[in-house]
UniProtKB/Swiss-Prot annotation:
SMART domains: Ribosomal_L15e
Organism per entry: Methanocella arvoryzae (strain DSM 22066 / NBRC 105507 / MRE50)
UniProt protein name: Large ribosomal subunit protein eL15
Renumbered residue ranges of the record's region Disordered: 155-196
GO biological process: cytoplasmic translation
Keyword Lyase on entry: no
GO cellular component: cytosolic large ribosomal subunit
NCBIfam families for the chain: PRK04243.1
Length: 196
């Protein structure tokens, strides 16, 4: 069976440092570091990933690149007396992932658009870069698209901010169902944040 062009792109991005992608990284990151936090781009860097997540080259859809700082929350160790068990240094799980932060920033930059999905495109020692697919729910070409018309409904307003994207649901523990997820539904907050 003949491999598609998208499969070759996907294979190259699996191990960027061992393929031609790694050679492009150095030049790209130098340019990206000079850019603002959120910037609109002409076309996706990873076309295979963008297409898999719902991107189409048509009116009403744009792609933006956003960068966010790397690492977890820097929490200093207490200098006052208490049990090390109660310092809260090891078992803290952050409420929002880096990817979700990037989606929210892009959503605020383009208030007339809704976040469809996002994917990783690069990182260095300080930042991670994500590309976010945004859709205009009021555009006629989106309303008439059988795959994207669902986003025109009012229930999807503010998807990124409410954690309804794929990255948002992952952070809220709602990618799984059944045994072990009892504290994740209807939400983590409803169970006093014991679900994560």
């Amino acid at each position: 069976m003949v491999k598609s062009a998208y499969s070759y792109i996907r294979d190259a991005w699996k191990n960027p440092s061992k393929t031609y992608v790694g050679e492009l990284f150095w030049e790209r990151l130098q340019e990206w570091r000079k850019e603002p936090t959120v910037v609109k781009i002409d076309r996706p860097t990873r076309l295979d990933r963008a297409r898999a997540l719902g991107y189409k080259a048509k009116q009403g859809i744009i792609v933006a690149r956003a960068h966010v700082r790397r690492g977890g929350r820097r929490k200093s160790r207490y200098s006052r007396g208490r049990k090390s068990k109660h310092m809260g240094l090891r078992t803290l799980t952050r409420r929002t992932s880096i990817q979700r932060m990037a989606e929210v920033r892009a959503s605020r930059k383009f208030p007339n658009m809704e976040v469809l999905n996002s994917y990783w495109v690069g990182q260095d020692g300080k930042h991670k870069w994500y590309e976010i697919i945004l859709v205009d729910p009021h555009h006629p070409s989106i309303a008439s698209d059988k795959n994207l018309s669902w986003i025109t409904k009012g229930t999807h307003r503010g998807r990124a901010e409410r954690g309804l994207t794929s990255a948002g649901k992952k952070g809220r523990g709602q990618r799984r169902k059944g045994k072990g997820t009892e504290k994740n539904y209807p939400s983590v907050q409803a169970h006093d944040r014991r679900g994560k």
